[in-house]
Structures are given as structure tokens and as C-alpha cells.
Amino acid sequence: MATKSLAGQDVEVDAEGFLVDASQWNEDMARAMAKEDGIDELTDKHMQVINFMRNEYMAKGSAPNIRSLGKTSGVSIKELYQLFPKGPAKLAAKFAGIPKPHGCI
Amino acid sequence: MTENNEAEPISKVSIVISKGSLEGVYPGLIMANGARAEGIDANLFFTFFGMDAVHKKHWKNMKVATVGNPGLHIPTLIGAIPGMSSLVTRMMSSKIEKLDFPSIPEFIEMISDTGAGIYACLASADLFGYTKDDLVDQVEGIITVGEFYTMAAGGQIIFT
């Protein structure tokens, strides 16, 4: 655990930079985290995926893996990898301020 | 969980799938898909009987080996009864489906969509008389072992 400043607010993050408390999140933090991970600008499409991840997590208590993200988010797996080349489910969860999806698939 | 933050993170893996059974193919697919999900570059290389997983006629019909497979805990002579492999495969496939794992064809399509490279082995293709047309569209090429090593340069190689 470490404290870091994201979009002007001090938040607690884990070793991989995921927010510890999802309720501290806002969209400016998503943009700041994306920049750190090499995505300079979050487009509407990025935000669609990020908000979808966040809503799923809030509704179900866990974030979808890449397979169900491809099936249910309205964005195909191919496109997801174009949007988030370094791992769509992982990065979209991170930018959404929720825990990393758990599971092997 | 033990974490070693000092170690250099893995940035690329090349995974060889050489077995032609259901249980021989899944681990390599899970590792390739998992690598891409972590942002790690991945190549899949199908060789020998592993090529069935990317063969148009066989990829939907991969079976669990019921003979010579002590992990299954079925005596070899029982495992050899005709139809046993299909039965065990059906049981395992239904379990796999319940866990919401993709089937082998869906998994290979998915891995291809993640941007991983999928290749088949030239020596094996020659041995079985397969051409590119016999293999599913996700296979980008039939390559030599030398080309495989060139492609794998700078990453880890995993043989399954």
C-alpha cells in the first residue's frame, strides 16, 4: 500500500497502482492513471469500457474478465486490445478505480 | 502470494503446444490468453499433435486422453474401452462450460483477437501432409523452427 497524488487528490493504491477505495474515484483520476500507463487521451470509447467495468463491479462485486467484457460491453475483444494494448480488463479496471479482475481466463 | 518486485517483468512469451489432447491444449491457451491480458506479448506455436487444435477438421473434436493418463484416476484397461475417451471428454467439457471457460475454437479465436501470433510448425505440417488450407484462418503461417526462434527472441519460451 502506498499513498499517491492523483488528479490533485491523495489516494491509497496497491503495488500495481489500483485504488484501494473505489469510492475515492473520479474521471480525472482515470485520465491521470491512463497517462501514467501510456494512454495520453481517454476517448469516449475508452470511457464507455471504463464506466461499464465500474458499473459491473458496483452491481456484482466483481469486474468482468476480458472474455465477458468482449461479450457484454458492446466493444469487441479486438477493439478492446486496440484501446488498451497493455491488457484491456486489467487497465480498464485500474482506470475505473476498481480491483483487478480475478481469474485465469 | 509472494511478490518479487526486484525482478524484471516478463514482456514476451512464446508458447509451444505439442500435445493433441484436450488437457494438453488448454494450459497453453490459458497461458497465452493470460499473458495478453497482462499486457505481455504472446506467440502460440502449434507443433506435432498439438496442430489438431488449429486444424479445421479436428479443432472442435479435441478429446481427453483416457489411456496412459494416470491423473485421470481411471485404470488403463477401463480407459481403453471404446467410447470412454468421448464420455470423459463430454464430462470434462460440461465442467469446463460450467466454469465459463471458452471451448477450444472460441479460445483460439479470442487469443487471435488479442493480437497474439498463432503459427504452425513446418516439420509437423510436412509430416501430416497439412497445408495452410487445412488449418483455421487464425493461423498466420506455417513456419520453421528457425523462424520460431527468431520470433521468440527477447522473450521466454514455454513448451507444453
Residue ranges and their predicted role:
Chain A
Residues 4-36:
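N-terminal first-folded block
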Residues 7, 12-14, 20, 43, ...:
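Generic, ordered loop/turn and secondary-structure boundary motif
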